């Protein structure tokens, strides 16, 4: 899929991986890049505009933990401005197993709520045009970092939720896939807390392993968006982009 002239909403598009990915996206000649983030960063927005002045870059403050009604209200404003939105990227995330409720609220519940809200505008059963959802998971959604089970569990939930969305595409008209970064050098992994302090030095130990840069991750992130494979579970690790084949152990039969 070419991203030229597409309208993209990027939740948390100013973070470590997020900002590098936003830089790559504007190079693809989007029509509009709408960034929703909790903290404004005028310098980053100005940089994105300077990279490609043909792309309209807009920022709205957004906390994914707000009620769905607030998200719907914001999306109404965005859809009124753009008329159509082609891609939603759900990228909000925290890594701190001290904050159990917030980790689940940001990494999973917020993603589900944002997705649910945009279905009001996209669902073909309501006369919508359909759309594409790219959810950011993590390799911990495949195999947990057991010292941070809350974070790992939230990312496993993202993978399952997104796989379900993909299978619902014939009903809703909305396709979905996950991009799952491996250990990436960002502020997210420089310092964080393990669950119940089971490993006080978990961040340091994690960074002893091979990592990738956020730029490497961002380049593969955008490649995954361009490949646009419904139901794909992408592994973005050590500068590579590979599809994951999920093993089915049970079938609901529905």
Curated annotation (Swiss-Prot):
Q: Which organism is it from?
A: Drosophila ambigua
UniProt keyword terms in alphabetical order: NAD, Oxidoreductase
Question: What are the leading ranks of the lineage?
Answer: Eukaryota, Metazoa, Ecdysozoa, Arthropoda, Hexapoda
- Where does the chain bind NAD(+)? 10-33
Q: Give the residues annotated as active site.
A: 151
| CDD domains recorded | ADH_SDR_c_like
Q: What is this protein called?
A: Alcohol dehydrogenase
Which PANTHER family does the entry mention? ALCOHOL DEHYDROGENASE
> Per the record, GO CC terms?
cytosol
Q: Which PROSITE patterns match?
A: ADH_SHORT
Q: Which GO terms of type biological process are on file?
A: alcohol metabolic process
| Family according to the record | Belongs to the short-chain dehydrogenases/reductases (SDR) family.
SUPFAM superfamilies per record: NAD(P)-binding Rossmann-fold domains
Kindly give the Pfam families that the UniProt entry links to this protein.
adh_short (PF00106)
One function term, GO molecular function aspect: alcohol dehydrogenase (NAD+) activity
Highest taxon of the lineage: Eukaryota
How does the record describe its quaternary structure? Homodimer.
Q: Where does substrate bind?
A: 138
Q: Which reaction does it catalyse?
A: a primary alcohol + NAD(+) = an aldehyde + NADH + H(+); a secondary alcohol + NAD(+) = a ketone + NADH + H(+)
EC no. given is 1.1.1.1
**InterPro entries noted in UniProt:** ADH_Drosophila-type, NAD(P)-bd_dom_sf, Sc_DH/Rdtase_CS, SDR_fam
């Amino acid at each position: 899929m070419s991203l030229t002239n597409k309208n993209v909403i990027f939740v948390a598009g100013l973070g470590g991986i997020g900002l590098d990915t936003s830089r790559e996206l504007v190079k693809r000649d989007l029509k509009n890049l709408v960034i929703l983030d909790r903290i404004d960063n005028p310098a980053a927005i100005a940089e994105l505009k300077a990279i490609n002045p043909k792309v309209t870059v807009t920022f709205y403050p957004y906390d994914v933990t707000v009620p769905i009604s607030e998200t719907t209200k914001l999306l109404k404003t965005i859809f009124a401005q753009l008329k159509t939105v082609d891609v939603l990227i759900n990228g909000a995330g925290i890594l701190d197993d001290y904050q159990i409720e917030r980790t689940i609220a940001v990494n999973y519940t917020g993603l589900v709520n944002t997705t649910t809200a945009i279905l009001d505008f996209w669902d073909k059963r309501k006369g919508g045009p359909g759309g594409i959802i790219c959810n950011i998971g993590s390799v911990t959604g495949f195999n947990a970092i057991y010292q941070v089970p809350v974070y790992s569990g939230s990312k496993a939930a993202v993978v399952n939720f997104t796989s379900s969305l993909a299978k619902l595409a014939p009903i809703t008209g909305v396709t979905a896939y996950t991009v799952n970064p491996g250990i990436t050098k960002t502020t997210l992994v420089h310092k964080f807390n393990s669950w119940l302090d089971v490993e006080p030095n978990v961040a340091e130990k994690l960074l002893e392993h091979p990592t990738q840069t956020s730029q490497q991750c961002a380049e593969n992130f955008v490649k995954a968006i361009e490949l646009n494979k419904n139901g794909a579970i992408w592994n973005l690790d050590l500068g590579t982009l590979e599809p994951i084949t999920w093993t089915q152990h049970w079938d609901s039969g529905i």
